[in-house]
Amino acid sequence: MFRPEEIIETIKMIKMENLDLRTVTLGLSLRDCVSKDLDELKENIYNKITSSAENLVETAERISEKYGIPIVNKRIAVTPISLVIGGAIKDLDKEEQIKACVEVGEVLDKAAKKVRVDFLGGYSALVHKDATKEDRALIDSIPFMMEKTERVCSSVNVASTKTGINMDAVKRMGEIIKETAFRTEKAIGCAKLVVFANAPEDNPFMAGAFHGVGEGDKVINVGVSGPGVVRAVIEKLPDADFGTLANEIKKVAFKITRVGELIGREVSKELGVKFGVVDLSLAPTPARGDSIANILEAMGLEKCGTHGSTAALALLNDAVKKGGAMATSYVGGLSGAFIPVSEDSGMVEAVEAGALTLEKLEAMTCVCSVGIDMVAIPGDTPASTISAIIADEMAIGVINNKTTAVRIIPVPGKKAGEYVDYGGLLGKAPIMEVNKYSSEKFIKRGGRIPAPLQALTN
């Protein structure tokens, strides 16, 4: 039985502290859709998605209403498209292969709109060691696919602790990001494109969600939110030491995660689909008070980004994991604190104040998930510089055996200090300054940075 004060506490979390479930994501295998005929492949994919997800949104909304817990997004993640498209494009020339990939992307978008999900992830390639012909075709098609779709998200895994960093793929992704920015309005395509090291197979969050090869046919994964709830707890403890602070964060993370698992299991039961994982990531929104930066400031930092920010974030991340892991046995996805710039009003203010730089942001990614996220940079930034930013972030992931990622937006025509506004969950991004010195010769070397000693675990 729940005590009355627990019920009141939960209501307060939802009404006053922005507690919500960020996403309920249906993972779908498309491996049974494979065909040598492109039209048949597209038809199979469309039918599989629309039949499997036809009740997803309606079910999630009904359960959200039943428990009074807002579910912000309903999403789908599919098998990486590069793994299912090979047979249909193997006899085509390069230009036709790219066109075929885009057509599949358009089918994904059409299916996403049909079942009314907010986003569909899985326009993806796994090239952490090398790339196949279909991997390369899919990567080359990303800017054109983004130009023609609205809800499809793309991710490319270019590094892992076991294989090292595929620098040829890193170089290419810098160019792809630049081209995507050019081809989409306000570079919005780049907000739906992420480059990974050690990408998880069960991530419910966009833009990096895909349905991994080790997964079953269908699964429900959920992602929690709740920075406002954590901040409220810390603000009640202005003089507490760090041990007490960590303990209180653990307790509230336990409660947040318990809500996430409850909703996830209810949705999966209603849909007749297996329940997968709860992703413990604290995901901010542009709403006032729903901010990771504000949590760090509540700990005693004048502004997020000042000295001590990395330590504060490490404490937060660790305490959230410990509390969340107590609440559910099935933890997965990214499971940490997100520090996206545009999606976090406190981060935006820190950049505006000059407290948070790109370099400090990179340092903070060493102790949380997921990486350089929703960072807008000047549109004239060279592709080689973007590739170098990716390489740095991949190195952090590979050496520390953790997931890291880059979602960076070179906005055409914008300079440092200006803004790009996307509205909604993506928020408003200040254009951040990048290092003016060139990395081009370094990136041109190509090849693969070998796996670190940490890879030799057998």
From Swiss-Prot:
SUPFAM superfamilies: PFL-like glycyl radical enzymes. Pfam families: DUF711 (PF05167). It comes from the Archaea. Belongs to the UPF0210 family. This is UPF0210 protein MJ1665. It comes from Methanocaldococcus jannaschii (strain ATCC 43067 / DSM 2661 / JAL-1 / JCM 10045 / NBRC 100440).
